[in-house]
């Protein structure tokens, strides 16, 4: 059971139903993934994955799916993962790109890009057209970012290693 400091409880009780917040905080996060439409279609990938597990759509992301049963196989070991057809991504992480709705030809700056879940999602939404700057301020995180960009076939992205203040006035 989670223990919250009183100051935290006081603060968040003003913003939300704290009992509901606490209940959801104690729940196990459901495993989820997103189909990478740069490399495959949603229907083709769903069909390929049916032999491993059942999926349920993520309501706010048409390429996102919850995995109903992961006990039989490690998703990161699947051929579909290695080929970049899917990206293991928490469903909550699919929300920002879905709200931003980047389009082909747009110019997008991702300030905290590693390991690349939202970056690869935006690149797919942009159909690899336009420019996506994938920035992170920690050198050791760029390796996973670069690896994921390559695995997912992202071609419209430049990676940078800067603190956020470097981009002040960036437009």
Task: Provide a role label for each language-model segment.
Residues 1-171:
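S-adenosylmethionine
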């Amino acid at each position: 059971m989670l223990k919250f400091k009183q100051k935290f409880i006081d603060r968040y009780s003003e913003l939300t139903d704290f009992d509901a917040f606490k209940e959801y905080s104690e729940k196990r996060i459901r495993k989820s993934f997103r189909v990478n439409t740069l490399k495959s279609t949603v229907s083709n990938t769903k069909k390929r994955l049916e032999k491993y597990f059942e999926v349920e759509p993520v309501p706010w992301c048409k390429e996102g799916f919850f995995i109903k049963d992961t006990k039989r196989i490690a998703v990161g070991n699947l051929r579909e993962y290695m080929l970049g057809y899917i990206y293991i991504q928490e469903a909550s992480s699919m929300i920002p790109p879905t709200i931003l709705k980047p389009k082909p030809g747009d110019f997008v700056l991702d300030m905290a890009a590693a390991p690349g879940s939202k970056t690869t999602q935006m690149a797919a939404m942009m159909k690899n057209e336009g420019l996506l700057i994938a920035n992170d301020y920690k050198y050791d995180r760029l390796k996973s970012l670069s690896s994921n960009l390559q695995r997912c076939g992202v071609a419209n992205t430049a990676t940078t290693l800067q603190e956020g203040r470097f981009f002040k006035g960036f437009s």
